UniProtKB/Swiss-Prot annotation:
PANTHER family: FLUORIDE EXPORT PROTEIN 1-RELATED (PTHR28259:SF1)
Top-level taxon: Bacteria
Cross-referenced HAMAP family: FluC
Entry function: Fluoride-specific ion channel. Important for reducing fluoride concentration in the cell, thus reducing its toxicity.
Keyword Transmembrane helix recorded: yes
Regulation: Na(+) is not transported, but it plays an essential structural role and its presence is essential for fluoride channel function.
Keywords, in A-Z order: Cell inner membrane, Cell membrane, Ion channel, Ion transport, Membrane, Metal-binding, Sodium, Transmembrane, Transmembrane helix, Transport
Catalysed reaction equations from the record: fluoride(in) = fluoride(out)
Family of this protein: Belongs to the fluoride channel Fluc/FEX (TC 1.A.43) family.
This protein's record includes keyword Membrane: yes
GO CC field: plasma membrane
Protein name (record): Fluoride-specific ion channel FluC
InterPro entries: FluC
């Protein structure tokens, strides 16, 4: 299958997952903090680490990288939404939540990419 179609398919799946996860997190935790965006970014970062590590070991096809790594995870995770939500918190004067949002997204996402890679590398 054409890689462009795989990216589009993965992107549509990732966007739907992001929407459903965000709605679920608002229902569970309310909307005072962007937990949905945090969760999709952390989960997506972990999966990106796994995909990257598998790709480094040639255990994943270029087609699967396009479908999952670029399409699904590209649509699932969202830096633009993270940035907008952080700016809204700042504009509301909630510096603590804005700072927490930045620190949690960056530190947890970096850690999850690392964890995903280590999980794969330790199994081989």
């Amino acid at each position: 299958m054409n890689n462009l179609l795989l990216v589009a398919l993965g992107g549509s799946i990732g966007a739907v997952f992001r929407y459903l996860i965000s709605i679920f997190m608002i229902q569970v935790f309310g909307s005072s903090f962007p937990f949905g965006t945090l969760l999709v970014n952390v989960l997506g970062s972990f999966l990106m680490g796994v995909i990257y590590a598998l790709g480094q070991m040639s255990h994943i096809s270029p087609e699967l990288k396009a479908l999952i790594g670029i399409g699904l995870l590209g649509a699932l995770t969202t830096f633009s939404t993270f940035s907008n939500e952080t700016l809204l918190l700042l504009q509301e004067g909630d510096w603590l939540k804005a700072t927490l949002n930045v620190v949690l997204n960056l530190s947890l996402c970096l850690f999850m990419v690392y964890l995903g890679q280590q999980l794969v590398f330790s199994r081989i």
